[in-house]
Amino acid sequence: MPIKLNASFSDSYVDVSQYRDQHFKGNRYEQEKLLKQSNTLYVGNLSFYTTEEQVYELFSKSGDVKRIIIGLDKVKKTACGFCFVEYYTRADAENAMRFVNGTRLDDRIIRTDWDAGFKEGRQYGRGKSGGQVRDEYRQDYDPARGGYGKVVARP
């Protein structure tokens, strides 16, 4: 029988961060309202090799997962280090924000944030080369995220 983590105060929502999706179609107030009602989490800093099954195994400990959308490089169609996790209820998503954010998955410290809701096309990285923007400018070598940054000149 799977273990389910429950927060003792799951009726209150976890604070919304200052990050806002620049591609959101609507104003800041509308986005804030959606974030405070959302059942969807953005998960970042994943290894390029982390599988949907690994994400499910971790996030299902906080509640019933409706679906997982793995972020893809828009050119290569390979994983590029992020995903969206959608729960059936806000309370289960709040549990994940409390208990999963900052934990280790596939030898990486992952971060979670509220997402206004997945829409088709958002599964693709927004970087110029097809992946995530932050990976294009990384100066260190990170084999789990594709090696060196693609834009930064190597010594």
From Swiss-Prot:
Family designation: Belongs to the RRM NCBP2 family.
Matches recorded under CDD domains: RRM_NCBP2
GO biological process: mRNA cis splicing, via spliceosome; mRNA transport; nuclear-transcribed mRNA catabolic process, nonsense-mediated decay; positive regulation of RNA export from nucleus; regulation of translation; regulatory ncRNA-mediated gene silencing; RNA splicing; snRNA export from nucleus
Disulphide bonds in the chain: none
Region (Disordered): 122-155
Gene: ncbp2
Main localisation: nucleus
Organism phylogeny: Eukaryota, Metazoa, Chordata, Craniata, Vertebrata
Protein name: Nuclear cap-binding protein subunit 2
Stored PROSITE patterns: RRM (PS50102)
InterPro entries: NCBP2 (IPR027157), NCBP2_RRM (IPR034148), Nucleotide-bd_a/b_plait_sf (IPR012677), RBD_domain_sf (IPR035979), RRM_dom (IPR000504)
Keyword Transport belongs to the record: yes
